[in-house]
Regions:
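Basic- and aromatic-lined ligand-binding clefts that recognize polyanionic substrates
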Residues: 58-83
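Solvent-exposed, polar/charged alpha-helical surfaces in well-ordered, non-transmembrane soluble domains
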Residues: 14, 43, 47-50, 54, ...
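Short helix-capping segments at alpha-helix termini
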Residues: 59-62, 87, 143-148
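His/Asp/Glu-enriched short active-site or ligand-binding loop at hydrolase and phosphoryl-transfer sites
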Residues: 74, 79-116, 148-160
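Acidic-and-aromatic substrate-binding clefts and catalytic sites of carbohydrate-active enzymes
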Residues: 3-11, 36-40, 69-75, 99-104, ...
Length: 182
């Protein structure tokens, strides 16, 4: 889930594009500039998602529809309606977060990986912070030891109906002890 306003994606598009086009990684929409969508009117929601979609298409040649992740996990019926009107019908939430923002220690990140990296779980992590890099081998070992496989959002949801996805979706509000993920 990318924000195209973050320059790192454009700087590394030549490395990422082949992975996206081959299906090894999936790009989905996290809005252009990362606003709380519940503070925007319908046109603002559409503009954030569509501008990001246009950038994704330009960089990677693929559409991110129908998936989007609302920044901070915040959405309401008005956001879902506006997003749906332009083809973003599947908000993707998470069951836990690595909490890998810049202020979090590698030890705490790994403890969160132990807690949340379980079967059938969506775990939120970030590409724009380096705090997880020193423990990537350890995290990969945890994933391997647990027999887990990383999959794309498309693989995770498969052919589930909108009603099935909505019924199975985790709460959009992180638990109180967690930092608010972005």
């Amino acid at each position: 889930f990318i924000n195209a306003s973050y320059t790192g994606f454009k700087e590394h598009v030549s490395l990422l594009r082949p992975l996206v086009q081959s299906g090894q990684i999936q790009v989905a929409n996290h809005t252009y500039s990362h606003p709380d969508l519940t503070t925007l009117d319908a046109e603002g929601v559409k503009e954030e998602l569509q501008r990001n979609e246009d950038e994704i298409m330009s960089m990677f040649g693929v559409s991110s529809k129908p998936y989007f992740r609302p920044p901070y996990g915040r959405y309401n019926d008005a956001v879902l309606k506006a997003a749906g009107e332009i083809g973003f019908t599947r908000p993707v939430m998470w069951n836990g977060t690595t909490g890998d923002e810049a202020k979090t220690s590698s030890r705490v990140i790994y403890m969160r990986c132990i807690r949340y990296m379980l079967p059938q779980q969506i775990v939120l992590g970030h590409l724009n912070y380096e705090t997880i890099i020193p423990i990537l081998d350890k995290v990969k070992g945890l994933i391997d030891d647990r027999g887990l496989t990383a999959v794309t959002v498309r693989d995770y949801y498969g052919d589930a109906s909108e009603e099935e996805i909505k019924a199975a979706a985790p709460s959009p509000t992180p638990t109180p002890e967690e930092n608010t993920p972005s």
